[in-house]
Every structure is written in structure tokens, then in C-alpha cells.
Amino acid sequence: MEPYKIILVDDHSLFRNGLRGLLERCAACRVVGEAASGEEFLAMLGGVDADVVFMDFAMPGLDGAQTTERALAQRPDLKIITLSMFGEESYYSRMVEAGARGFLLKDSDIGDVIEAVETVAAGGSYFSPQLLSSLTGRMRTREDAADE
């Protein structure tokens, strides 16, 4: 099997370098491009083939949602996974509405990252376990409040 081709889009070079290092340890993954901004990613989009894009949410200039919308308008086949420090509902809702197929918190372990790549590359969706746990907890709280 060919390795998954991955692009990293994040304005923090230290984070990109660390994630690239972790992904390169995985025989099933190959980083084929990096961008420090949404604008840089959109400029490179036509010249790089990728299976999965890891997209930061909070970047200067175009944020992750704006970049995702524009990228998918050019390449509807792209599979984008959001990487963010922010797990609030407004962030992942915005990214899902923009067309992202997954959402990982930046404190996820490498096993979750690899599982997200495999799941999203195969056409599925992936949301970090911490995020799903938080979401279901909030939903239960709302249901309990509505029952009172």
C-alpha cells in the first residue's frame, strides 16, 4: 500500500516540525507539503497531491474555516482534518460547516492522529475522543436542564 500523502497547515513551525517528525515515523504516512498560512496553502494547492490535510483553526489572515471553504471550492476531493487547541463547540461546528471531515485537539496522541488519517482517507469522519466526550457531556447537561 502507498503511504498516505499529507499536507500540514499551521502557523507555528515548531508544531509543524513536531507533527511531521511523528508522522514520518509511521510507514503509512508521508508529508508531501507544509504551509504556514491559509494563503500559502491555497497557493500550493494546485501543485501538490494529498490524501489528507491537517488544518490549524486559528491562523493569522485566513483562518482554518475560510481556508477549508476555499480549498474545497478548488478541490472538492480534499479530506481536511482540523487541528486545534480549542475544543469549544463553536470551533468544530464552524469547521464541519466549512467541510472538514475531522477535528483533533492538539494534545491528541499519535495513535489518534494515525487513526484520523486512516479513517478520513477512507472517506469517514473522525473526531478526537476528548471532543466527543465533552460534546456528549454538554448534550446530557442540556437534556437534564430541559427535563427540569
Kindly give the residue locations of the regions a language model identified.
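Receiver (REC) domain active-site loop signature in two-component systems and cognate sites
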Residues: 59
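Active-site residues of response regulator receiver
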Residues: 10, 56, 84
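Short hydrophobic/Thr-rich beta-strand motif most characteristic of the beta2 strand and flanking loop
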Residues: 28-36, 44
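Short, flexible helix-to-coil linker/hinge segments that flank and couple to helix-turn-helix
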Residues: 90-97, 101-148
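Active-site beta3 strand of CheY-like receiver
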Residues: 48-54
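A short, hydrophobic beta-strand element within the central beta-sheet of small alpha/beta folds
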Residues: 77-87
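Short amphipathic alpha-helix used as the core "switch/output" element in two-component signaling
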Residues: 65-77
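Acidic catalytic/metal-coordinating carboxylates
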Residues: 37-40, 62-66
